[in-house]
């Protein structure tokens, strides 16, 4: 603003905004080592990953228009196309977090209990603070910034029970792709955090109409877990699913042995914990179930038949002592699986750190997870789990240009390890095991940099 309070048509702020609007739609090229996945490495082996040691990613109007070897694509660019050179860093699709709680930022790394005690001791008091809309707004901004800083470009998110907690997060999201839902509870929780079957229907219908399909936002019906919902509330969720079949669903299932036993007491007619949701017709393609540690093959077969997906939450499962996920059993039944931080039960926003924990969990199950499989789960695999793989997940032409720049040499330890790696698989495995937010140089949403690490090396 000028001293008179008017925006100067020649001032630096005006010129920057004008440039930003212009460059948002003009063609841009990014040069680096580039990789993405076009299929699941478990099924398609080495052919599932594309790798360009000197690659070029070309973006226009927020979409991918080309990707390939720089030597092939550079001569095809228009003369004035800006080329952003990130060499020797790596460009890959943005990371996808399939399960996270934004109201739990303040209770991450809270000591000493397992799931059910943890909810009562830490989670419910923290979520109670979201009755204050301004507080929800401040946490939402922090949450979005933290996702960007860790290279996460898409997330499926639990809000609190307060409808305005969804509003706060959706307003803070900008152009980020999010799936968000208001938590539903009408029993076995503090009275101040409980709603009713009637309010469940009314509040969710309002939020669906307000946010679902706006910009890059989608809505998810979000019963916290079966023990905190009555029959009437689950019937309301079922009615909403039938009325709005393109809306997602997210919840928890079979995370903890004590929880599983509690569900058997509360729903004595059910065959299993998962069967409770199946009874209310809540197993469908856009449904995602977090944890799934204590399922049997009948449960897994139903998940596979329904098209529902699983969020693998390794950090949270270790921290809360919940158990070990069986990835091979899920794959055997053709269930889509994505990686999830599950903050605040999980102890890091970093999907790279969660991949490191996933590898260790699977080692304890005598199962392997090479880097290609882990990075697939964090990108295209996560997109498939969320039924977003036609929009995001890799660099297929026409997809939305969400990507990150990774510096493998960001710390002395990883630089030392990379110097002794003999091939791409060794380098990616070291990155998966040792990487974290320090290795994220930049995060791009729709081709626009929304986070850049200080001192990030870039030549244009």
Each model region followed by its residue ranges:
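His/Asp/Glu-enriched, well-ordered alpha-helical/loop segment
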Residues: 279-283, 328-415
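Metal-coordinating catalytic core of metallo-dependent amide/deamination hydrolases
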Residues: 164-292
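Active-site gating loops and adjacent loop-to-helix segments of metal-dependent hydrolytic enzymes
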Residues: 106-136, 179-197, 255-284, 309, ...
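N-terminal amphipathic/hydrophobic targeting modules at extreme N-termini
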Residues: 2-4, 9-12
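Alpha-helical scaffold segments that flank or form the walls of functional sites
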Residues: 108-176, 199-213
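C-terminal cap of metal-dependent C-N hydrolases
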Residues: 43-45, 400-455
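N-terminal metal-binding scaffold of metallo-dependent hydrolase/deaminase domains
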Residues: 20-77, 89-90
